[in-house]
């Protein structure tokens, strides 16, 4: 039979207090006695001799029974002069700490207090610190991920901004001013396209001859605008409309970009409000161009012709006014008449339509010429004009390539943007706002990235502050465990004692 002296005593830490009470090692009402002891300790530590070791025992740690024993040992050296012939000390310091030790040893109060500290550390303090450290680590991972997302997002939005600027042909330093500056180069680009269209005379004559041959009767001239461009190039709308070159050309001026409003100023806008007079509180709201939602009607029926229509036709009315304002003396090109054929939308669309019409004809003719090996096709063109019979498929394809190049230039995205800028200054504002929005989003994401870096450092600093506390708490908890196991072992004739479930 195994000697029971060597059988270990295993005690679950969570049940340690109940175990001590059940085996009558301590009193059930030990907490009230511990409160009394704590009060006496708080009073006693107010009057202590100067000693480095005592100062270390009293600094920042929970003073328990074994600390008190060490303090008494130290006081035996500092208070040796107060010892009488009976071996007792007359020093009040020594008396106070000896009384504290006596109270601790009554009903083994020190043991149950140490056990209470151990249970609290194991069940609450240590898990709480570990949870806080784990939270800091998780926050660092989250902030690191968000930092990478913010950096990638900022780079992507910045790349989109510069890519869009590249599409518009600007650098992005001053979007609005650069967009308006692009329009200044538009006439020279359109002049080059007009010069390229002047080489289409042969293709136009070929188309005209084919139409006359197929219809078997003289017809009106085809492609009037392309035919007009041959000698005149990209002239003004006035010259195209009237047939005479204007003596004066008054081109519409583009609006200069407004001054940027300072961040610390409020832009109240210009509502055209008159100042309030000192004698009254009347404010004039007679602002042209603003629809106040008020229907103004004259009392007289005869005034109906002068009534202003604020309805959905306001835009059409505005266009009518603008066109009316272009009336100018003879020989003066003003307003839309001052624009070139390729600048004015109506004539530009007609120009593109005629280019496409000519391209389709030549493409179809090239297909027909590749299939004219049969006798029927040859016989059909025996009576055709010489200009039709003298063409080759390669010549047709060459002319088609020239036309496609001109159409591609006029319908390119760059020129479409420039045409919209020329037609509507509001388009410049929309494009500017869109591009600036991308840049602002990039800046906001960059700020978010910096904020995530800052928060990551804060979480790292918090973790660095918690880890030493956890290490110290684990060390003290292991110390408490050894003290409790040794004390209980003494009570059972040296049997080994194991406190289970501490995980420290």
UniProtKB/Swiss-Prot annotation:
<feature type="short sequence motif" description="Shuffled ATG8-binding motif 2">
    <location>
        <begin position="290"/>
        <end position="293"/>
    </location>
</feature>
<dbReference type="GO" id="GO:0030332">
    <property type="term" value="F:cyclin binding"/>
</dbReference>
<dbReference type="GO" id="GO:0030262">
    <property type="term" value="P:apoptotic nuclear changes"/>
</dbReference>
<keyword id="KW-0833">Ubl conjugation pathway</keyword>
<keyword id="KW-0963">Cytoplasm</keyword>
<dbReference type="Pfam" id="PF05600">
    <property type="entry name" value="CDK5RAP3"/>
</dbReference>
<dbReference type="GO" id="GO:0044877">
    <property type="term" value="F:protein-containing complex binding"/>
</dbReference>
<dbReference type="GO" id="GO:0042177">
    <property type="term" value="P:negative regulation of protein catabolic process"/>
</dbReference>
<dbReference type="GO" id="GO:0019901">
    <property type="term" value="F:protein kinase binding"/>
</dbReference>
<keyword id="KW-0539">Nucleus</keyword>
<dbReference type="GO" id="GO:0001933">
    <property type="term" value="P:negative regulation of protein phosphorylation"/>
</dbReference>
<dbReference type="GO" id="GO:0001889">
    <property type="term" value="P:liver development"/>
</dbReference>
<dbReference type="GO" id="GO:0005874">
    <property type="term" value="C:microtubule"/>
</dbReference>
<comment type="subunit">
    <text>Substrate adapter component of the UFM1 ribosome E3 ligase (UREL) complex, composed of UFL1, DDRGK1 and CDK5RAP3. Interaction with UFL1 anchors CDK5RAP3 in the cytoplasm, preventing its translocation to the nucleus which allows expression of the CCND1 cyclin and progression of cells through the G1/S transition. Interacts with ATG8 family proteins MAP1LC3A, MAP1LC3B, GABARAP, GABARAPL1 and GABARAPL2. Interacts with CDK5R1; competes with CDK5RAP1 and CDK5RAP2. Interacts with RELA. Interacts with CHEK1; may negatively regulate CHEK1 and thereby stimulate entry into mitosis.</text>
</comment>
<feature type="short sequence motif" description="Shuffled ATG8-binding motif 1">
    <location>
        <begin position="266"/>
        <end position="269"/>
    </location>
</feature>
<protein>
    <recommendedName>
        <fullName>CDK5 regulatory subunit-associated protein 3</fullName>
    </recommendedName>
</protein>
<dbReference type="GO" id="GO:0010921">
    <property type="term" value="P:regulation of phosphatase activity"/>
</dbReference>
<comment type="function">
    <text>Substrate adapter of E3 ligase complexes mediating ufmylation, the covalent attachment of the ubiquitin-like modifier UFM1 to substrate proteins, and which is involved in various processes, such as ribosome recycling and reticulophagy (also called ER-phagy). As part of the UREL complex, plays a key role in ribosome recycling by promoting mono-ufmylation of RPL26/uL24 subunit of the 60S ribosome.</text>
</comment>
<dbReference type="GO" id="GO:0044387">
    <property type="term" value="P:negative regulation of protein kinase activity by regulation of protein phosphorylation"/>
</dbReference>
<keyword id="KW-0832">Ubl conjugation</keyword>
<dbReference type="GO" id="GO:0000079">
    <property type="term" value="P:regulation of cyclin-dependent protein serine/threonine kinase activity"/>
</dbReference>
<dbReference type="GO" id="GO:0032088">
    <property type="term" value="P:negative regulation of NF-kappaB transcription factor activity"/>
</dbReference>
<dbReference type="GO" id="GO:0043407">
    <property type="term" value="P:negative regulation of MAP kinase activity"/>
</dbReference>
<dbReference type="GO" id="GO:1990756">
    <property type="term" value="F:ubiquitin-like ligase-substrate adaptor activity"/>
</dbReference>
<dbReference type="GO" id="GO:0012505">
    <property type="term" value="C:endomembrane system"/>
</dbReference>
<keyword id="KW-0256">Endoplasmic reticulum</keyword>
<dbReference type="GO" id="GO:1900182">
    <property type="term" value="P:positive regulation of protein localization to nucleus"/>
</dbReference>
<dbReference type="GO" id="GO:0007095">
    <property type="term" value="P:mitotic G2 DNA damage checkpoint signaling"/>
</dbReference>
<feature type="region of interest" description="RPL10a-binding domain (RBD)">
    <location>
        <begin position="353"/>
        <end position="368"/>
    </location>
</feature>
<comment type="similarity">
    <text>Belongs to the CDK5RAP3 family.</text>
</comment>
<dbReference type="GO" id="GO:0005813">
    <property type="term" value="C:centrosome"/>
</dbReference>
<dbReference type="GO" id="GO:0071901">
    <property type="term" value="P:negative regulation of protein serine/threonine kinase activity"/>
</dbReference>
<dbReference type="GO" id="GO:0008283">
    <property type="term" value="P:cell population proliferation"/>
</dbReference>
<feature type="region of interest" description="Required for interaction with UFL1 and mediates interaction with CHEK1">
    <location>
        <begin position="268"/>
        <end position="504"/>
    </location>
</feature>
<dbReference type="InterPro" id="IPR008491">
    <property type="entry name" value="CDK5RAP3"/>
</dbReference>
<dbReference type="GO" id="GO:0030968">
    <property type="term" value="P:endoplasmic reticulum unfolded protein response"/>
</dbReference>
<dbReference type="GO" id="GO:0044389">
    <property type="term" value="F:ubiquitin-like protein ligase binding"/>
</dbReference>
<dbReference type="GO" id="GO:0032991">
    <property type="term" value="C:protein-containing complex"/>
</dbReference>
<keyword id="KW-1017">Isopeptide bond</keyword>
<keyword id="KW-0472">Membrane</keyword>
<dbReference type="GO" id="GO:0051019">
    <property type="term" value="F:mitogen-activated protein kinase binding"/>
</dbReference>
<keyword id="KW-0597">Phosphoprotein</keyword>
């Amino acid at each position: 039979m195994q000697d029971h002296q060597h059988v270990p005593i295993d005690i679950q830490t969570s049940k340690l207090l109940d175990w001590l009470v059940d085996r009558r090692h301590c009193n059930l009402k030990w907490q009230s006695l511990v409160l009394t002891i704590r009060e006496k300790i708080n009073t006693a530590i107010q009057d202590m001799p100067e000693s480095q070791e005592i100062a270390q025992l009293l600094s920042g740690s929970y003073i328990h029974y074994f600390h008190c024993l060490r303090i008494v040992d130290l006081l035996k050296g500092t208070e040796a002069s107060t010892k009488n012939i009976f071996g007792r000390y007359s020093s009040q310091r020594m008396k106070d700490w000896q009384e504290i030790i006596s109270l601790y040893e009554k009903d083994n109060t020190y043991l149950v207090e140490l056990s209470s500290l151990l249970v609290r550390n194991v069940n609450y303090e240590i898990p709480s610190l570990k949870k806080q450290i784990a939270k800091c680590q998780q926050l660092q991972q989250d902030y690191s991920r968000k930092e990478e997302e913010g950096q990638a997002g900022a780079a992507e939005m910045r790349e989109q901004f510069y890519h869009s600027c590249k599409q518009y042909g600007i650098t992005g330093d001053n979007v609005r001013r650069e967009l308006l500056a692009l329009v200044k180069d538009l006439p020279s680009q359109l002049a080059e396209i007009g010069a390229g269209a002047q080489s289409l005379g042969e293709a136009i004559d070929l188309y005209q001859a084919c139409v006359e041959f197929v219809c078997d009767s003289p017809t009106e001239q085809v492609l009037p605008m392309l035919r007009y461009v041959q000698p005149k190039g990209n002239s003004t709308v006035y010259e195209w409309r009237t047939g005479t070159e204007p003596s004066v050309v008054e081109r519409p001026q583009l609006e200069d970009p407004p001054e940027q409003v300072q961040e610390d100023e409020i832009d109240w806008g210009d509502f055209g409000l008159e100042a309030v007079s000192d004698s009254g509180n009347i404010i004039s709201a007679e602002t042209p161009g603003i629809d106040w939602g008020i229907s103004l009607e004259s009392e007289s029926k005869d005034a109906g012709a002068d009534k202003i229509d604020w309805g959905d036709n306001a835009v059409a009315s505005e266009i009518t006014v603008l066109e009316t304002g272009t009336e100018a003396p003879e020989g003066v090109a003003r307003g839309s008449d001052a624009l070139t054929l390729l600048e004015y939308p109506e004539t530009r669309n007609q120009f593109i339509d005629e280019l496409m019409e000519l391209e389709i004809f030549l493409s179809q003719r090239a297909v027909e010429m590749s299939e004219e090996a049969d006798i029927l096709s040859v016989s059909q063109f025996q009576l055709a004009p010489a200009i039709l019979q003298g063409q080759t498929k390669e010549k047709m394809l060459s002319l088609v390539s020239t036309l496609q190049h001109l159409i591609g230039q006029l319908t390119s995205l760059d020129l479409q943007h420039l045409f919209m800028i020329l037609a509507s200054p509001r388009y410049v504002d929309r494009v500017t706002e869109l591009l600036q929005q991308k840049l602002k989003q990039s800046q906001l994401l960059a700020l978010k990235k910096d904020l995530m870096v800052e928060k990551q450092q804060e979480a790292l600093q918090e973790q660095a502050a918690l880890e030493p506390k956890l290490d110290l708490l684990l060390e003290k908890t292991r110390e408490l465990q050894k003290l409790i196991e040794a004390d209980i072992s003494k009570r059972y004739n040296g049997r080994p004692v194991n406190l289970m479930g501490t995980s420290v």
